[in-house]
């Protein structure tokens, strides 16, 4: 009998556009794209393929339409030309989730987020504010805030301030169930354990 595994995949579909815009997008966002399949709906230019291989990104070239939920996003030009918001004017609010975040659920927020329940495998959290998880974290977290607080971590899919946590850093989080606070000084991640 043939042994197979079924997987759910999150993907970005990229339609035909200028290679320079695609290359700029890939260079700027390669850390976050590590967790996605990138689907090109055209034949990819060699210089774009070189960047995909350089960052070891998973990609597919196809003209075939794919089924699935679609999330409307900005064009690459709008994304790369968009001015950065001035965060100094308004302090983000805090949103508290007392429930578990299920597999397949995605939360995108400009607020600080506090999770009292578990974040299941296949769930994804992206926040411009600080993130605190006091349950078990098995899902993906992308935090752009000043700190990331985690208790019991069972995931290697953690990005803090545009930096993917290395295997060594993730291993420090897996050691025990104590609360860990992650901050960043310049380009150095600091992981402190609260006893």
From Swiss-Prot:
One of its GO terms (biological process) is regulation of cell septum assembly. Keywords: Cell cycle, Cell division, Septation. InterPro entries: CAP/MinC_C, MinC, MinC_C_sf, Septum_form_inhib_MinC_C. The keyword Cell cycle applies. Gene3D superfamilies: 2.160.20.70. It holds the Pfam family MinC_C. Coiled coil: none annotated. It comes from the Bacteria. HAMAP family: MinC. Cell division inhibitor that blocks the formation of polar Z ring septums. Rapidly oscillates between the poles of the cell to destabilize FtsZ filaments that have formed before they mature into polar Z rings. Prevents FtsZ polymerization. Interacts with MinD and FtsZ. Belongs to the MinC family. This is Probable septum site-determining protein MinC.
